[in-house]
Amino acid sequence: ITNGQNADLILVCCKTDTDVQPAWKGVSIILVEADREGYKRGRNLDKVGLDAADTSEMFFEDVRVPITNCLGAEGQGFIYLMSELPQERLGIAIGAQTAAQRAFDMTCTFVRDRKVFGKPVMDFQNTRFVLADLKTKLQVGWAHLDWALARHMKKELTPVEASGAKLWH
């Protein structure tokens, strides 16, 4: 779980009504305090990237919380989570697009400065072909991201459209 080592309050999505169908119904979001009996932090997990925030194991053994620790209406947790999904996916797309742009900019600097056979790598025709292709893909990505952001700001971005933004990037 992200920031598990530092969290004072943990949001747990769990099934609180096992009789209701379909399965996504009956899921609630429960707040669990880090000092609650039965809760224990585990180890930090090794990850590839995104090291600014830890990712930790968490253990819950017979943890009991009062009904007042239910965030929102009982059984509506999945609906709450899904209502935020487009924004979450859009955030991932923004991060990917900006990282791609930075990588492209760094590559352009490198091929301008790096010399091979007495001339900059930028002067080779194939390098220019590849950079032109990458720049075009970046431009399409920015245009798509602008479109998705505009829809999000109007509260019109659907989960499917947000998935497309994430997929592209």
Question: Model-flagged regions — what are they?
Answer:
Residues 1-4, 50, 87-91:
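Glycine-rich phosphate/pyrophosphate-binding beta-alpha loops
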Residues 1-41:
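A short core secondary-structure module
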Residues 9-13, 29-31, 55-62, 70:
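Conserved hydrophobic/aromatic beta-strand scaffold that supports enzyme active sites
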Residues 13, 44, 85-88:
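A short beta-sheet element
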Residues 21, 68-74:
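Cytochrome P450 core scaffold surrounding the K-helix E-X-X-R motif
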Residues 35-66:
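Flexible, small-/acidic-enriched active-site or ligand-binding loops
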Residues 39-41, 45, 50, 70-71, ...:
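Short clusters of hydrophobic/aromatic residues that line enzyme substrate/ligand-binding pockets
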Residues 57-63, 72-76, 82-169:
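Alpha-helical interface subdomain recognition
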